[in-house]
Amino acid sequence: MVRKLKFHEQKLLKQVDFLNWEVTDHNLHELRVLRRYRLQRREEYTRYNQLSRAVRELARRLRDLPERDPFRVRASAALLDKLYAMGLVPTRGSLELCDSVSASSFCRRRLPTLLLKLRMAQHLQAAVAFVEQGHVRVGPDVVTDPAFLVTRSMEDFVTWVDSSKIKRHVLEYNEERDDFDLDA
């Protein structure tokens, strides 16, 4: 037997319709992206979503301007150059490419995802652990934040830290280890 509901519980239940509730797909898509790219906080996803929405909105406003407008030409070129340099669009072709920018585009440029792409890690979970533990550097700087976005120009400079045991094991496996270099 079920107990009688208290007054405040009845008031709360009046606000909920258990028979006709809407299913929103946004939450499911959000959870898929969070799980697929191993995002640690939901705020990261919402931030990427806001940025992608702003890019799409800016591209739409630029497309609404007349085609011969010098401001449109300059701003479109600057926007496409910026997005291409960040790695969010594949080419500098046209403003139509800006419509494909999404939160997943930003997630694909995160450091752990690029470690997976560069075959420095087998799984995304391991890549996140390598970054958090300080085994990876981008250029001269050691990066410990998995949310670090890597641009196209910095993609070539993603390597292991010199003092990393993982680098030592990789070099030993490939028979390229030099005792003089690694004793630093």
From Swiss-Prot:
What is one term from the GO cellular component aspect held by the record? nucleolus
Is-annotated flag, keyword Hydrolase? Answer: no
**Keywords tagged on the record:** Nucleus, Ribonucleoprotein, Ribosome biogenesis, RNA-binding, rRNA processing, rRNA-binding
Q: Which residues cross the membrane?
A: none
Write down the superkingdom of origin.
Answer: Eukaryota
Q: Where are the annotated coiled coils located?
A: none
Q: Offer an example of a GO molecular function term for this protein.
A: rRNA binding
Which biological process terms from the Gene Ontology are attached to this UniProt entry?
Answer: ribosomal small subunit biogenesis; rRNA processing
The keyword Metal-binding appears for this protein = no
Family recorded in the similarity comment: Belongs to the universal ribosomal protein uS4 family.
Give the multimer and partner information: Part of the small subunit (SSU) processome, composed of more than 70 proteins and the RNA chaperone small nucleolar RNA (snoRNA) U3. Component of a heterotrimeric complex containing IMP3, IMP4 and MPHOSPH10. Interacts with MPHOSPH10.
Q: What does this protein do?
A: Component of the 60-80S U3 small nucleolar ribonucleoprotein (U3 snoRNP). Required for the early cleavages during pre-18S ribosomal RNA processing. Part of the small subunit (SSU) processome, first precursor of the small eukaryotic ribosomal subunit. During the assembly of the SSU processome in the nucleolus, many ribosome biogenesis factors, an RNA chaperone and ribosomal proteins associate with the nascent pre-rRNA and work in concert to generate RNA folding, modifications, rearrangements and cleavage as well as targeted degradation of pre-ribosomal RNA by the RNA exosome.
Q: What is this protein called?
A: U3 small nucleolar ribonucleoprotein protein IMP3
Q: What is the lineage of its organism?
A: Eukaryota, Metazoa, Chordata, Craniata, Vertebrata
